[in-house]
Amino acid sequence: MVRYTVDELFHLKPTESLPVQFDAEEFKAIIEKVKQIQALKEEEFNAHGGHFNRRRSSHHHHGRPKVKHTKPKVTTDSDGWSTFEAANKKVNEDEESENVSVAVVPETLKVKPNNKNISSSRPADNKDIIADKQTHSFNAFAALESDEEEET
Amino acid sequence: MSVEEVTQKLESVAVDDNSPKTVLSDSSNFEVKHPLNSKWTLWYTKPAVDKSETWSDLLRPVTSFETVEEFWAIIQNIPEPHELPMKSDYHVFRDNIRPEWEDPANSKGGKWSFHIRSKSSDIDELWLRALLAVIGETIDEDDSQINGVVLSIRKGTSKFALWTKADDNTEALTNVGTKFKQVLKLGDEDKIEFVPHSSTGKYVQATITL
């Protein structure tokens, strides 16, 4: 087996750079390109605060979201009585009344009939039962009397 | 055969001024090269920049060499380890062995490995020392236990690994591991581990620790 010690191999090292059997420039270019891509990725990573474009998960709330409520105004008079003043509510009431007036504006309302029993033999409304009731029963004597009058 | 023996042999063959020039007589226009014991291939693992790239896309042979002079020419023309991007690997493997566990020459082997947290300049020097020890065969046993050597560049650390063809020859593996520690300039407090490829990826268990 041919062996070379480290010193012997260093002794055989040419002082000048020698040509190689492969495209060293292309190899170096690939490595440089990879380094550039990695640098860009790292820059993007740092720009986003140490994480990539993660979508915000639905589990990011660790509690109920904070809703700011205005504190009610309480005034205390000279006798020591505290009075709750819902000043904002008054304004709201006015707004509500305006809303109500708007809601009263007449509109063309489409009445949707209840078709639930439309194919049934049962009347849809009890009033219909009364209306359909036969109000005049047949009177045979009355009918005979009328025939006699006609003959005379 | 040492380099001096090879040189002496060449000089003894030479009888006149027309004798072939070696790197020792003319470092740029030499005609005779110093042969290595084996043909070696330099492989490079490119870091993945696209999710579609597979391992086979990333691992590519760069070039091969069979002489000391060819080796130096390659070393002078490729980036040094500290110039490599993160997640790069250099592999130098014997003959046509692929630097993969699946290669038949590696399937029954294992590797000595050591992680170094060190300055980039030190990594360059240690990688060169490891290469010289491997291609010069001074780290190997007479029955040739070594298949190749790998350098993995990672963030904040570099991993040196020496791949062997067998995982059961404890005496030979211990000798190789001891020399590997010397090449990497490790002290007694530094521990290197030998892990068979068969256990890698499942339950990694070192069989020898030095």
Curated annotation (Swiss-Prot), chain A:
Domain of life of the native organism: Eukaryota
GO CC, any one term: cytoplasm
UniProt key word Electron transport: no
Presence of keyword Protein biosynthesis: yes
An annotated GO BP: positive regulation of cytoplasmic mRNA processing body assembly
Biased composition (Basic residues): 51-72
Keywords: Cytoplasm, Initiation factor, Phosphoprotein, Protein biosynthesis, Protein synthesis inhibitor, Translation regulation
Location(s) in or outside the cell: Cytoplasm
Stretches for region Disordered: 46-133
InterPro entries: Caf20
Segments of skewed composition (Polar residues): 114-123
Compositionally biased residues, Basic and acidic residues: 124-133
GO molecular function, one term: translation initiation factor activity
Function as written in the Swiss-Prot or TrEMBL entry: Acts as an inhibitor of cap-dependent translation. Competes with eIF4G1 and EAP1 for binding to eIF4E and interferes with the formation of the eIF4F complex, inhibiting translation and stabilizing mRNA.
Name of the protein in question: Cap-associated protein CAF20
Organism: Vanderwaltozyma polyspora (strain ATCC 22028 / DSM 70294 / BCRC 21397 / CBS 2163 / NBRC 10782 / NRRL Y-8283 / UCD 57-17) (Kluyveromyces polysporus)
